């Protein structure tokens, strides 16, 4: 049925109508619904064929051969990913998605779609990445499998958060938490969903719920083995603890999170976690710990000298100079912040502007500082980080930072 429809250039929506919905057409094509004789005749008439022709089965050997061919292409695409050839992986996965049309090929098609979404993310194509995830979210197989549903919703929540669309990110993270509620304890998806929700909630300014979400995430992370997921969970809980007024515990959690990553290959995650720990230590940690972490950040940047890493080091150096009330040094370091660095999310860009504003104010360039504060606040607002925007406006109006209490701009979430 699917092959006949596609051969005629029809969509499932084109075939639907009257007694048929597009979702029902999809279920029939996937072998998940057996139509009545009346509906089968209706479908055949719309396709200009007969029920007998639609019911003709392929030879089992041909179906098996086709499936094995698709699996082989999927394996080749995975090899391309391991080799870092993302463009080749994309072509191979798109071919699998196009060919996997049989009812017995649902799982292969889903895996290809999922991996294609991942590859599009690595190719820095957020629009197509999002479109691929939304297609997966509407896939009948996704909707009938809570684990698959959760994985897609989590990935979509993280993408939207990175793209500066925090309210949507929170919504999909909440959806992920909801669909994982019935999964058995210890499933990684349960912790992943709660980590996505906590991170998006903190970034968007829903700090009143952060401590409770952190407690739930900590309980979910307890049975997890050492590794990236457990590290990410501890990191997220640390952010909630700091905002709740427990900076010492937050720093201890970040230290534990770094220990969890010691034997993993997640270089990008380790670098960002190190930045988060250093920035928080500069805001609330002992002077010797903050200085040691800053020294390590300098060493890491010397090894990984990307525009983004150099910009983050400039932010950290600026924060350190501000901690020592050294306005000229803060301004000198802030001048090295590159707001065009490609890896900066909208939220991170606003955070960079906030540090620029503080440096200019400390160096007595009030007009420049005011302009930077306004740009930072607007950047936060556009991303949906309304609480951070409000804190920025307050700091601009007050003419100085609060001497006591937490600095929410110092919280980097996973």
Model region roles, listed by residue range:
Residues 2-7, 11-13, 22, 30-36, ...:
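C-terminal non-catalytic interaction modules
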Residues 36-53, 399:
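DNA major-groove recognition helix of helix-turn-helix/homeodomain DNA-binding modules
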Residues 64-69, 104-111, 144-155, 184-196, ...:
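Alpha-solenoid helical repeat architecture
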Residues 68-103, 119-122, 162:
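Alpha-helical segment of the N-proximal tetratricopeptide repeat
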